[in-house]
């Protein structure tokens, strides 16, 4: 109910915004940090799609399902790169949804973002999006998630895969596709 009320109050509608929420509230300014990269749009950070769908299954509340549905569709259509060198990656919480250079596979993870919604409703567009991310590991060859931490000339391998956010995403994508 809180997220749905925020969508109504803040008019987060339209192709780019509907189904997403802001990530961090600014207590000093008494507003969402809509203008600060790293704090603005949530882009499925903290997996609200999963816990909202689980809350719906426990309660049967339609308002919870419609918010989870909107978030699942938004993340599948807006937050994921569907073609090109970044196919399978997603943009972390940015001022605009595709904003800065934080492109990571975890934002596009098939298993916890969309698989449950797909199984509940069979939306073929969600199935297409899950298929788009199954080879996200190849996209990190084009954009290393840790490129700002390591000098390219000192790297022994072409990219990095963190055990938590990256490997768990790859395994989730492969398992979901299987």
Regions found by a protein language model. Give the residues of each.
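Catalytic cores of extracellular degradative/oxidative enzymes
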Residues: 1-178
């Amino acid at each position: 109910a809180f997220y749905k009320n925020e969508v109504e109050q803040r008019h987060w509608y339209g192709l780019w915004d509907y189904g997403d929420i802001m990530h961090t509230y600014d207590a000093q300014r008494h507003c969402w940090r809509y203008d600060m990269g790293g704090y603005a749009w949530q882009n499925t950070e903290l997996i609200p799609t999963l816990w909202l769908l689980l809350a719906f299954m426990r309660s049967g509340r339609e308002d919870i399902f419609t918010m989870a549905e909107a978030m699942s569709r938004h993340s599948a259509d807006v937050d994921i790169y569907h073609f090109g060198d970044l196919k399978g990656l997603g943009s972390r919480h940015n001022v605009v949804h595709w904003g800065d250079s934080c492109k990571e596979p975890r934002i596009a993870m098939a298993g916890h973002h969309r698989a449950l919604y797909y199984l509940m409703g069979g939306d073929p567009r969600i199935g297409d999006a899950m298929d788009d991310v199954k080879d996200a590991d190849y996209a990190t060859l084009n954009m290393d998630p840790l490129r700002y931490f390591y000098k390219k000339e000192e790297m022994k391998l072409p990219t990095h895969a963190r055990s938590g956010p990256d490997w768990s995403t790859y395994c989730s994508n492969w398992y979901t596709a299987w």
